[in-house]
Amino acid sequence: MTITAADIRRDVKEKDIKFLRLMFTDILGTLKNVEVPATDEQLDKLFENKMMFDGSSIEGFVRINESDMYLYPDLDTWIVFPWGDEYGKVAGVICDVYTPEGEPFAGDPRGVLKRNLKSMEKLGFKSFNLGPEPEFFLFKLNENDEPTLEVNDKGGYFDLAPTDLAGNTRREIVNVLTDLGFEVEASHHEVAIGQHEIDFKYANALKACDNIQIFKLVVKTIARKHGLHATFMAKPVHGINGSGMHCNMSLFTEDGANAFADPTGDMGLSDVAHSFIAGLLKHAYNFTAITNPTVNSYKRLVPGYEAPVYVAWAGRNRSPLIRVPASRGLSTRVELRAVDPTANPYLALAVLLAAGLDGVEHKLEAPEAIESNIYVMTEEERKAHGITDLPSTLHNAVKALPEDTIVTEALGEHVLVNFVEAKRIEWASYAQFVSQWEIDNYLELY
């Protein structure tokens, strides 16, 4: 359904909307916004693409001497938030970032994904679909409304009350998401204490990434209302599972067919699917800095906590990087299991698409599927199967990122340079920090 300027003007009037959030995403994946009053004058500026902002203070955008940027709204992303306060109702729209010359800004992550989707269309595909599975933790707040490290419950996978104490919080999140147009498919407690997952229906990659950003905003807002802090940090607690964001991906052709499906193919998969998998495996080591972009991300990517460590693929086996869920036909998809929810979704999907399409374009052949538990294999067994490791640290991942031309071209020079610089600073800061583990292990020993 296409939303027009007239639809938005009518919404503003009929729903008594007082403020507009003009939302965009920085290179590190943080949702930003410029808020303006919902007056006729401001609406005119919005629809005429005349909303200007200072991009010099936004992570990875521009220098201070070239800071003027413009926000072009994608009207189809219009939402009216179902919460408000004494200052009035708030609505929002996701925007693309443009230069004063009217060109898409090279540092806009949403624009990066759109550019890669155009490259996909040139290869004859109509859409790249994503079904994300974002996980998050809920922590209690202290008397100053600051997050603690005390989880909200001691529940486990699919638990019910009384061990799952967040049922009402999740229900309100689901209700709000539904009001905003999401089709929520499942809501449940995850494996770790205090960990939760809410799954929503797949969509084309651009809409799915927009949904991820709005989803995070809703989860954090509703959690705070219930006296809790929601975090999408990959591994907030030692010794238990971390939070992932499995990405279920599929390509569709112009005639509406799933390009990954072939009933006569090996495992019910087409040659396109096998080549897409091969491309993902080929570039996995190099794109991991994008899909797992924080120091903490690599505390999750360790054996023993249901997170992938090894570059391989399988059918139902959940130990490799990639698996193919059992559904076939239009539901045929490839699930990449390494991504965590700290990733910038637009950049992550851009590099995953580029990697997969490299495999398709060059008709790469996927290696054998590994259906045995890789975690219990010896190093020699893994080597015999051609199984390699993902990067073990952010330092190694960032070092590998610029070495892959497919991945770097997907990102573009502006994003690549600014992302790498930010992550090198992050690693240097971490490397100099003296942790409690070091104190516990070395202070008395030496």
Swiss-Prot record:
L-glutamate binds at N241, G242, R300, E306, R318, R337. Residues 109-446 form the GS catalytic domain. Residues 15-102 form the GS beta-grasp domain. This is Glutamine synthetase. Oligomer of 12 subunits arranged in the form of two hexagons. In its feedback-inhibited form, interacts with TnrA in order to block its DNA-binding activity. The record marks R63 as: Important for inhibition by glutamine. Mg(2+) 2 binds at E135, E190, E197. It comes from Lactococcus lactis subsp. lactis (strain IL1403). It catalyses: L-glutamate + NH4(+) + ATP = L-glutamine + ADP + phosphate + H(+).
